[in-house]
Amino acid sequence: MFDLIIRGGAVYDGTGRPARWADVAVSGGKIAAVEPLPQAQAARVIDARGKWVTPGFIDIHRHADAAVFRPGFGELELRQGLTTIVSGNCGLSCAPVGPENLPAILSYLEPICGRVPPEAAQETLAGYFAAQPAAPLHTGMLVGAGTVRASAAGYQVQRLEPAHYAAIHRRLEQALADGALGVSLGLGYAPECFYTTHELIRALAPLAGQSIPITVHMRQEGGGVVTAAQEMVEVARALKAPVHISHLKAMGRDNWRGKVPQVLALLDRARQEGLDLSCDVYPYTAGSTQLLHILPPEFLAGGMEAIVRRLGDPDQRRQLARRIESGDGFDDIARLAGWDGIFLTSLHCPEDHPYQGMSLARIAALTGQDPLTCCCDLLVRERGEITMIDFMADEEDIAAILRDPFSNLISDSTYPTEGQPHPRVYGTFVHLLTRFVLQRGDLTPELSLIHISEPTRHLRIS
């Protein structure tokens, strides 16, 4: 007598082997048998005829650092088949954070992680794990190197002093000892966008030769994506450490169907050299992050208060307009996606709520402003805490990445406290199976399930 039998489904084991028709018996919360069990009985029987039975889905790239503290967390994730998630991505973990720059860090995190409760903003990851409520699925954390740098040195552009590096090293080592699964970088975000490659390698010195996974939101994902990937090869070579590129894409129509194949070929050559490089991708042509991400690096210096002051200055706005017009040296999302391709999904001020879900082009037309002025006014009024969805990627590039054997699927889900989230929060895995398996045929069912049930190989967890 079993507790549960899932009867008659097509059972995929997630290794790439073809499905087999079988029953799955469960006792005591563990799988007891996978075979035809026509005579077996159970307290509960699920009829899976005509359905797939798969391992639990794993998402190694979410931003649920603060969301795990919300009541009812986990239902949304379980209902889409997730049994394991990893947060702390893109350098933006909500711990460890010291008291020195705490308000600035939490303000910067809010559009992506949502409002961070005091019990989550711990000085150590051990404290974070101890405070975290029980969840109905497995949760893991990366330590965000951006948060670590901001804790040690704030959001300033200036060159770091030896004492800053020492503080960064201590925090990284402590977080890894506390149970971090690896280190995440956010080179497209402040303050890590201020690193040179040499400085970045110096900051990550404790990882040298340690086989500790490094995941990275690269410095650029548009016209400069190949150069950014070359930088990651250099980091992997210098540190002799595994590097995993997060949400690989080529933003902007001019970069589609050319840059991604170049990056994949670059990574393949690096692996032939003996380096450990991999990547992941989400299955949507639209991304989602903080609206501040449209700004060039120099406009992100000093933290949120400085950013807001800068955007309120007419001279600074004129300089910003020139920078966006030229697009040099940063991911110019205003040009890559277009003002009509940037939609605002999380706004806090009551007067701005009617604009939620609208494009910046549409809001500008309604307010009688040019899009950049409209954008700056909103960022000032909302104190920078706006989440956007931006349409900038290509489905053929996504398919090419999915076909690469060293890639896996992620959602890159953000969890703003209010607003309209990107559908990837709840639809990523269904979208992969329906769009790229059943409709387009880019992947077989067997290969698709490797992408979503075995991505932990890139983080060395099982």
What feature does the model see in each segment?
Residues L443-L447:
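C-terminal amphipathic alpha-helical interaction region
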Residues A40, A48-E119:
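Metal-associated gating/positioning segment near the N- to mid-region
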Residues M1-G56:
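Histidine-rich, glycine-flanked metal-binding segment
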Residues I450-S462:
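Single conserved hydrophobic/aromatic residue that forms the stacking wall/gate
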Residues H61-D65, H217, H451:
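Histidine-centered divalent metal-coordination motifs
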Residues Q174-E234:
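Divalent metal-binding pocket/active-site signature
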Residues Y128-P162, I168-Y189, R237, A241-P242, ...:
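Active-site neighborhoods of metal-dependent hydrolases
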